[in-house]
């Protein structure tokens, strides 16, 4: 369960790959890791998270049916779906994001999944989620977004088959809107409709009907879902708002239908809803902007932009900001641990590693086969094969190539977490011992045990290590030992990509290939939004002094509107590497904003602020969002 440890920080592309491109860019399943095995385990994990009536072909044998009366008190059938993590609550927002990312993985790398014998299992995992969403959407303007609540759930430690906690259902409707929840669910059903189009066309059409209704509902009745379903706020609060989900849903509906009204929505609302303004290096269940930007870039590179090329170009610039920041070639970069893992936060950091790895993989693949070539970053070009090599390093870190030698995928390798923070896995299976485990008995008899869990949560990707690569395998260390569905979902596509045989390409040939430059066949563009010409940032040292044998530097920063005849509004700045105090800006959700008395910068006007740094190296300052009016 996220407990506000999810995606709140500053913050794919389709097309199955041609074999020639796969040979050129591919990795070998044989560089020390069995990616096909990791893929099988990662998909299997979703069966351990199932709620509802389990089918005869259930492969995780220690689980049994649960939540069989969900929704009954509300007069609706809400049996089914997924538990989000190590608890027994069904949270709609992360569940929908999970299904969206599983679907996207299949759409990009379904052939590779089929080659590994896992495509059917992956599709079954998607359908388990979409079957539930159909139930949760009984009317066009009603969507049930949660069953159970985190507060009562956390007071008990029980198997899902035994749970006695509240199963109250919570919904959004016109009087209690939830645009982010409804739009993410619309995105999930639109993406899934493409997955099932060739095998279950009737089901695919039904998903599209629900998706269109949910998008219309989300757009018409605007509001954050956690203002309506307040019990979700402390666990999956909507910190990024609903603008990213509205754009995300529109992009997926365009992909699913080719209805250009959705593309017009995406292009026409890019500024108002943040898609063309925000440059963010974090992607997850809350912040969807990088995913939207990569999808929009795909439409542009495929020649599907039509009259909206200029708007989609701005999306693409932000997508490349994300790529450059992740691979370490941006104006500001994602931090890395000493062992090389991308690092955002202590609580469930690996969710961001897997989601970023997926976006990087699809962007690199599509850039290569479309002729786009290298991504031009502030610190140098990022070739597609360099991006993929970096992705491989992140996946290998998860699978055990890290300073601890620990695999953070349960059941993979010889050394992996044994005390996963998970109710069902940590208590003896009900099939082995059907004796009822009460709310507090679970805590007294099972939660505090020093032994490993009696049931293997095979394939689960846990939260992972901290910024120093340290990890404590303890059940009560939920920040590091709890797994979540949205950790695994993006990883499916990446593992399928890595598991591909790639024509027998050897590692030494791959290394030789990385030294060969790729010709860029298209015009280059900055990875940053159009701030290089519209907004200028200049830093200067204006004073120094010594205190207690340390030298302090006073920096003056000038931010200037360089546009021609346009006023800059809603300016947001990102700041990293700051070791002292800052004056002249106000803190905001994703960085800093100008003081309230300066709501706009007219052409040629400047904003000035200062900070003190106990080192000669300046802080990194960049523009994360703005509007030109």
UniProtKB/Swiss-Prot annotation:
Positions bearing carbohydrate: 520, 540, 561
Reactions that this protein is recorded to catalyse: Endohydrolysis of (1->4)-beta-D-glucosidic linkages in cellulose, lichenin and cereal beta-D-glucans
N-terminal signal peptide: 1-30
Any one of the GO BP annotations: cellulose catabolic process
Entry keyword annotation includes Hydrolase: yes
Gene Ontology annotations for the cellular component aspect, listed alphabetically: extracellular region
Protein name: Endoglucanase 15
Active-site residues, record numbering mapped to chain: 87, 421, 473, 482
Protein family (similarity comment): Belongs to the glycosyl hydrolase 9 (cellulase E) family.
Subcellular localization(s) per the UniProt record: Secreted
Keywords for the protein's UniProt record, in alphabetical order: Carbohydrate metabolism, Cell wall biogenesis/degradation, Cellulose degradation, Glycoprotein, Glycosidase, Hydrolase, Polysaccharide degradation, Secreted, Signal
Enzyme nomenclature, EC number: 3.2.1.4
InterPro entries: 6-hairpin_glycosidase_sf (IPR008928), 6hp_glycosidase-like_sf (IPR012341), CBM_49 (IPR019028), Glyco_hydro_9 (IPR001701), Glyco_hydro_9_Asp/Glu_AS (IPR033126), Glyco_hydro_9_His_AS (IPR018221)
MF (Gene Ontology): carbohydrate binding; cellulase activity
Enzyme class per UniProt: hydrolase
Alphabetized Pfam families for the sequence: CBM49, Glyco_hydro_9
Gene3D superfamilies linked: 1.50.10.10
